Amino acid sequence: MIENNICLLTDSYKVTHHYFYPKGTEKIYSYLESRVGAEFNKTIFYGLQYLIKKYLEGRIVTQEKIDEADNLIANHIGPDIFNREGWQYILDEHDGYLPIEIKAVAEGTPVDVGNALMTVENTDDKSYWLPNYLEPLLLQVWYPSTVATLSAEVRKLCNFYLEVTGSVKDNLDFMLHDFGYRGATSTESAMLSGSAHLLSFSGTDTIAALTMPENYYNDSNLYGFSVQATEHSVMTSLGPEGEISQILNVIDNAKDGVLSMVIDSYNYRNFLEEAGKSGTELNEAILNFLDGEDNKIVFRPDSGEPVSTTIDCLNLLSEGFGSHLTDKGYKVFDLNIGLLWGDGLNYQKIRDILFAMKSAGWAAQN
């Protein structure tokens, strides 16, 4: 089988439509919109250029692809179904280039729902069947557009709570971090969704997304950044009795900068109480690390109910390391530490956490 055979990148039923259109049809003009009734009133359009460059650009129709598609469709649906004549015409008359024109809003643009995001039309009257043949492929733009929209809305949410709690906004670009690689359906999905996230935030662990701007958008800038961090396999490598020893090992071997540590391998409360207890070896190790210029430690609870656990962790950290008030009266940690939730969140849960923090007197910047 030929990889990415354009003749086959469609729905089965669309292969039959070339003989269903009225005789004399010469032009098909199709458009994509985000339907009214969506969760948000604007859609961030993103991902089209990738689809064009990956699947539609260049001499993509070949004799081998036509022959393969003809044989497959004959067995899949029936003989004389595949539009061999139409594809052969594109190969012979257009040298394998698709005779279509695609127009779209600039990628990254927020567009009110109910408005056209892109249009597709044929540029050769004999290829009237082609625009809608490409619908299944082009509509894959829904996924990166959805992720881009969601990240943009979360950024608005974070910005709002930073403002109302009197927080500095130095960390806004990193308040929503992408750990989505393992949750994506494929590496391609991770690349698309991960780069969509980077339209609004700079924090990501999805390395697959980092090359997207240069490879498909002629932009060599790096837009995603991460930090050194642990996972449960690291923190539990010496067992429950060796937890503190392993934490000390992690801190001792960490490079300068931000260090993120998962704290719920056994009991997050025990972890934070020991970390904040003056005079303990762990407390001294943390304070020594924080003495380094621009060093920061982020504590990451990954289990339990996110809202209540977040407030509990904030209070425990404040008891151990101290806090002060913003100009609007909300608590901020005295030291360069922070809290990160790494699992099971959606827009509503993020909103709940930020609202609960404000209600409990905590600034969003923590």
Identify the function of each model-found stretch.
Residues M1-E39, I90-P99, G108-D327, Y347-K349:
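Buried, small/hydrophobic-residue-enriched core segments of structured protein domains
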Residues G338-N366:
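Anionic-ligand-binding alpha/beta catalytic cores of soluble enzymes and soluble regulatory domains
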Residues R59-V120:
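Glycine-rich, N-terminal phosphate-binding loop and its surrounding beta-alpha-beta segment
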